[in-house]
Regions:
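Catalytic-loop of the protein kinase fold
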Residues: 116, 120-137
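Short beta-strand micro-motifs within the conserved protein kinase catalytic domain, predominantly
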Residues: 64-76
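ATP-binding glycine-rich loop module of kinase domains
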Residues: 2-55
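Conserved short submotifs of the Hanks-type protein kinase catalytic core
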Residues: 73-87
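AlphaC helix of the protein kinase catalytic domain
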Residues: 88-100
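Activation segment/activation loop of eukaryotic-type protein kinase catalytic domains
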Residues: 132-175
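Helical subdomain adjoining the active site within ATP-dependent kinase catalytic cores
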Residues: 2, 200-259
Length: 259
């Protein structure tokens, strides 16, 4: 793999040559040479993601996007803020034996809830909330990114195939797949993100997606015994919260009680 590539998604590379900004695109062009490419032309998807970032605007817990940049005639990439510690999931897996302090992890959870609150205030659905789309910065501050599958409410329809990963997906609970409330889906996923941060492991880590889906369908969730913020996580999973603001307030109260 080319040296500047720091991430790889389904149809895009993320590369950085200066460790200050990153380029997300389906071709990596450097010094007039195409160093890597995906077969799928992602111009439309990148333009949509740029539009979502512009719609969201500036926020301390949203990854900053500088817009589309032509890297070669007719070839565009997204210029993004560079996350020095990568995504939260990768960081957790690389530091499995040395978790961050409980206080730092609670603040990471709060950052995530505040970012999602802003996303919802701007009437955007992320549609793929997970720790692999949370990015870690200096002092372990978190910003939400990767809006490739997101939509603006009232302007877009949810596309088939766009959904959360198994451990982050709200069970049907007697509903049709597409009839689950969008906010409840995202708040359930927020609960799983908080779990992953506080437990320092993803829900049912290492198990197959199908097995996780079966357990969730039966109402079986990972044990929360001994995990800080267990009540908040459980309430997210039980659909007890009406907004990310409520989750953020609960986390603030918990942080204050720990002092």
């Amino acid at each position: 793999m080319w040296w500047s590539i720091v991430g790889l998604g389904g149809s895009c590379f993320v590369s950085s040559t200066d460790k200050r900004t990153a380029l997300k695109g389906y071709q990596v062009w450097e010094e007039g040479e195409c160093r890597a490419w995906c077969q799928h032309n992602s111009e439309k998807e990148l333009a949509r993601e740029a539009l979502i970032y512009k719609h969201l605007g500036e926020h301390p817990h949203i990854l900053h996007c500088y817009g589309l940049e032509e890297v070669h005639p007719g070839i565009n990439s997204l210029r993004l803020e560079y996350a020095p510690f990568g995504d939260v999931r990768k960081f957790i897996r690389e530091h499995k034996a040395a978790p961050l302090t409980k206080g730092v992890r609670l603040r990471m959870a709060l950052d995530t809830a505040l970012g999602l609150s802003h996303i919802h205030a701007r009437r955007v659905q992320h549609c793929d909330m997970s720790c692999r789309n949370l990015f870690l910065f200096d002092n372990y501050r978190v910003k939400i990114g990767d809006f490739g599958g997101s939509l603006i409410e009232g302007q877009d329809e949810l596309r088939g195939g766009v959904c959360e990963e198994a451990a982050y997906e709200l069970p049907l609970r007697g509903r049709e797949f597409w009839s689950r409330p969008a906010r409840k889906r995202e708040l359930f996923a927020l609960g799983s993100a908080i779990y992953e941060i506080m437990a320092w492991a993803s829900p049912y880590e290492g198990q197959e997606d199908g097995e996780i889906e079966k357990k969730y369908a039966k109402g079986e969730f990972p044990t929360l015994e001994g995990i800080t913020a267990s009540n908040i996580i459980q309430m997210c999973w039980d659909e007890k919260y009406g907004s990310a603001d409520e989750v953020a307030e609960a986390l603030r109260a918990l942080i204050a009680s720990q002092r």
